[in-house]
Amino acid sequence: MAGRYDRNPFDEDDVNPFAGGSVPPASNSRMPPLPHEPGFYNDRGATVDIPLDSTKDMKKKEKELQAKEAELNKRESELRRREEAASRAGIVIEEKNWPPFFPIIHHDISNEIPIHLQRMQYLAFSSLLGLAACLFWNIIATTAAWIKGAGVMIWLLAIIYFISGVPGAYVLWYRPLYNAMRTESALKFGWFFLFYLIHILFCIWSAVAPPFPFKGKSLAGILPAIDVIGNNAIVGIFYFIGFGLFCLESLLSVVVIQQVYMYFRGSGKAAEMKREAARGAMRSAF
């Protein structure tokens, strides 16, 4: 009986399952190993070489930027100090904004002039531009006369009229009216009336253009136009156009001074100006 159980039933059989040849034997080749990856995180010994020259350049640029920043801060603080000193002294720093393509003056009727006075101010501004147009056309007319043999002197005088007339009108009567509208100053209104009357007289004189005290045909008025149209029709037409422009400027100026004077009287500025003039005379006397 014991002989039947001498063999262990759990022993592995010496049977090769691949001996039949249906399954090919495994190859002895191995898969190639993975390439070695650098230890970005664990390799603490890795170093990065930074050129010393680039480090020096960066430090130099940083110092230059800090110096420029300090200079800008210094200029800003100095500008702020000047603005504060000017505001304490009552000086208003105005930004130049007109004409838009080349700002040379500060001019902002819509934001600085009261609404009920803006129409009068725009009319006065049109009068200033009209004077500039008249004097510019006067240069064109005298240039044509000079080409036709009238002499260079009348052309030079026309240039002088334009160079002195337009800035003079702005300083003497337009800017005082602008400030008077802003501040309601009676004395500035009086300054405007004085020089605007001179402006009106000049426009009327230019429309007539007698030969005295101005030189010959240096103004494109009616008398020179009649004189030159017989010799040269084109020059005569230029002078007649100048006469028409000076007439329109004179009419517009009369309308402007009439409206400003009506407002001046109606708002009580006339009596205020008299009181201010009286106080000024008393201060001068004492």
Curated annotation (Swiss-Prot):
One GO term (biological process): protein transport
Spans traversing the lipid bilayer: 127-147, 152-172, 189-209, 237-257
Keywords annotated in UniProt: Cell membrane, Coiled coil, Cytoplasmic vesicle, Membrane, Transmembrane, Transmembrane helix, Transport
Gene Ontology CC terms: plasma membrane; recycling endosome membrane; trans-Golgi network membrane; transport vesicle membrane
Coiled coil spans: 52-89
Biased composition (Basic and acidic residues): 1-10, 54-63
Topological region Cytoplasmic: 1-126, 258-286
Region annotated Disordered, chain positions: 1-63
Acetylation among keywords: no
Keyword Transmembrane appears in the UniProt entry: yes
Cited Pfam families: SCAMP
Compartments, as annotated in UniProt: Cell membrane; Cytoplasmic vesicle, Secretory vesicle membrane
InterPro entries named in the record: SCAMP
Main location: membrane
Record's bilayer topology term: Multi-pass membrane protein
Function: Probably involved in membrane trafficking.
Family the entry assigns: Belongs to the SCAMP family.
Protein name as annotated: Secretory carrier-associated membrane protein 2
